């Protein structure tokens, strides 16, 4: 995600992200896209110690937003409850009615909800974490106004494949 703007900055194009937002012509083709990537070159070269990426969004293979991370915090919106094995591909993600919160500095393996008897008390005490997470997710979603998703994620669901074939869309 961050490699494209970083490598292009190293090659002399430090503002590719901004150029692509307004339309950037390469050869005889113009590209106008939202690139969710950051130029990490100043961080890698030691010019700065500040990471330009303030948040990170996690998506599953169905293109569903499952979690987001900012600073030390991670908010989980959906869970894959199957543990390991290929079975994870046959079982659906579970949408949570209330997101789970993890402090990645104190709980890097995100196990407090399983190993602590007082996790949900702690969650209520840290509900303020939801406010910035809503802002970051809202910022991302707002990019869809000018840059809507170009394609639907591939599906192993036979009903969806059949529907796409009936609509004349062929296969994924």
Predicted regions and their residues:
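Long, internal low-complexity/basic segments
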Residues: 70, 75, 81-82, 90-100, ...
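C-terminal cap/loop subdomain of S1 sulfatases and analogous C-terminal strand-loop tails that border
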Residues: 1-105, 109-111
């Amino acid at each position: 995600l961050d490699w494209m703007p970083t490598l292009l900055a190293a090659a002399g194009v430090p503002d590719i992200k901004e150029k692509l937002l307004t339309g950037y012509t390469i050869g005889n083709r113009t590209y106008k896209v939202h690139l969710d990537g950051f130029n990490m070159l100043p961080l890698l070269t030691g010019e700065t110690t500040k990471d330009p990426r303030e948040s990170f969004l996690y998506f599953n293979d169905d293109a569903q937003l499952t979690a987001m991370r900012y600073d030390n915090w991670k908010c989980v919106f959906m869970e894959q409850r199957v543990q390991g094995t290929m079975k994870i591909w046959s079982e659906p993600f579970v949408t949570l009615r209330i997101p789970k919160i993890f402090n990645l500095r104190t709980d890097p393996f995100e196990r407090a909800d399983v190993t602590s008897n007082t996790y949900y008390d702690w969650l209520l005490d840290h509900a303020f974490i939801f406010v910035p997470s809503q802002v970051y997710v809202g910022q991302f979603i707002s990019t869809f106004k000018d840059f809507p998703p170009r394609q639907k994620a591939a599906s192993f669901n036979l009903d969806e494949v059949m529907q796409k074939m009936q609509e004349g869309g062929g296969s994924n």
